[in-house]
Amino acid sequence: MDNDVLRQAPLFSSLDDEAATALGSSMAETTLRRGDVLFHEGDSGDKLYIVTEGKVKLGRSSSDGRENLLAIMGPGQMFGELSLFDPGPRSATVTAVTDATFGSLSHDDLLRWLDGRPQVARGLLSQLASRLRKSNDVVADLVFSDVPGRVAKALLDLADRFGRTADDGVHVHHDLTQEQLAQLVGASRETVNKALADFASRGWLRLEPRSVVIMDLERLSRRAR
């Protein structure tokens, strides 16, 4: 496992090369093809996962089959940490958006790493705090922001993590369908498409298959506020 990717995870950002190499060698590796499910909401499990290649989506389903996307994650991001403290069922379904590879640590293996490594424990607390803050932001956005504002904010978040700056703007290969993007912002596909078309007509971005090119970050940022 690439040490640089491993250290992108807040939990392990403070590890030196020797410790990161030892940790990487103790992690099990899992590979999924696009569309494959790693685990379902309600499954039992006690592993923490770190994405090393590709992208995954974390989602929850309602009783009538509707899906809400909680997050899109890429290399260096981790999920499943709640199971280390609460052995209850998984709270979300994890599906590969692209071909993806993960490293995983079991509950017992991570506890051994936490023992005598206070910096790793602090990293875990930081990750949990960040996740809680993100949840609070999502709730606030659903209450106070309109759909175009939520779309703009989602695009900026994706650009921050997956964007590549070029002469014509920031290329964001998010690999999401229009329906998945709508699920991510908690709105209908039609409403999200209308917001995207409006942004494009204003010259803020250019739409491409499963990607966008953001040409005016400043105005898109203002719309996200």
Predicted features by range, described:
Residues 203:
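Glycine-centered, phosphate/nucleic-acid-interacting loop/turn motifs that mediate DNA/RNA or nucleotide
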Residues 97, 115-186:
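Polybasic "coupling" helices that flank or enter modular domains
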Residues 162, 167, 177, 211-225:
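Short, cationic-aromatic polyanion-contact patches
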Residues 71-133:
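Cyclic-nucleotide recognition modules
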Residues 190:
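Key DNA-contact positions within bacterial/archaeal DNA-binding proteins
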Residues 1-34, 83-84:
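Cyclic nucleotide-binding regulatory module and flanking cytosolic helices
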Residues 11, 36-99:
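Cyclic nucleotide-binding regulatory domains
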Residues 198-199:
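Basic amphipathic alpha-helical segments that dock to polyanions
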